[in-house]
Amino acid sequence: DKFDLIKKGDFWLSETPDTASIGWDAVLPRICSWGHFKCKDTGFEFLFFNLHMDHIGKKARVESAFLVQEKMKELGANLPAILTGDFNVDQTHSSYKALVSNGVLKDSYESADFRYATNGTFNSFDPNNFTESRIDHVFVSPLFKVKKYGVLTDTYRSAKATGTEKANVKDCPEEISIESYEARTPSDHFPVKVELEY
């Protein structure tokens, strides 16, 4: 309810972005969705982009990074932008560097006043996995102030496939009943939450 959607669209991450296609060395068709928003209270306008880069094509990821920035200029050269998604590369890859090296965008992780990231963003459905790699990113125009950044690593518990059993817990009051459940993640990626100010 805070924003009005002025315009929206999609384009393909390929050499022919206006036509359904697979780009460069990618193995799957990939798109980027975008919206032009206006804040009802302040009149502030911005572009929001969300994409899913290819998981195999290295050239496709780099070229997609350049293409998205071209589209930002085409759709609103004077408008600040937010770019989110599963980039399928971490902060060491050349496509990541292509997004942050020219001053058009900055990584909200690097820019945040307060950061909570005890793990990376990909977990492969295993809550015990740990990585420092962040493959899900939130890039923003320099105009935005990044107040907070967080990788939310919450898990939930469900009964094991073999059934529930009483947990072997020592020094537990007899009034407490604890069953041995399994920790699970809602997705193979952890969500990223960012608080921005403009």
Give each language-model segment a name.
Residues 29-49, 58-99:
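His/acidic metal-ligating clusters that form di-metal
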Residues 13, 51-53, 87, 144:
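Hydrophobic pocket-lining residues within nucleotide cofactor-binding pockets
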Residues 3-6, 63, 72-81, 89-198:
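Metal-dependent phosphoester-hydrolase catalytic domains
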Residues 14-17, 56-58, 155-160:
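A short local loop/turn or secondary-structure capping micro-motif enriched for an aromatic residue
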Residues 24, 57, 182:
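Generic anion/oxyanion-binding catalytic loop in active/binding sites
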Residues 52-55, 178:
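Short coil/turn segments at secondary-structure junctions
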Residues 1-45, 148-152:
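Structured beta-strand-rich core segments of catalytic domains in phosphoester-bond hydrolases
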Residues 10, 32-36, 50, 137-138, ...:
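Conserved hydrophobic/aromatic beta-strand scaffold that supports enzyme active sites
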